[in-house]
Amino acid sequence: MGGNVEAAKLVKKVTPAYPTIAQTAHITGTVVLRAVIAKDGRVQELRYVSGPALLMASAMQAVREWRYQPTELNGEPVEVDTTIQVVYSLG
């Protein structure tokens, strides 16, 4: 498949809440998610891949609200699969 592909650009990022139980237990790390970015730039088909289980729900909730400038192929919006990393750290 040839042509000019323009990658999706994040235009709205919602910071995930850090669950109190995870903070108290000093749990940090990166939650890795797989997503399909729809033609309109919305996140859809979000799946958990890896990372601390206590952080998964808050990461997924925040990422569902993210918005992207749609990916374009030859000037037309297309769906795209992507990997998203949400990093949690204390201090």
Regions found by a protein language model. Name each.
Residues M1-T24, Q61-R64:
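Acidic, low-complexity proline/glycine/alanine-rich linker and hinge segments
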Residues A8-V11, I21, D40-R47, E72, ...:
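Periplasm-facing N-terminal accessory domains of Gram-negative outer-membrane beta-barrel systems
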Residues H26-T30, A38, R42-N74:
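A short, well-structured alpha-helical segment
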Residues V31-L33, T82:
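A short, aliphatic-rich beta-strand micro-motif
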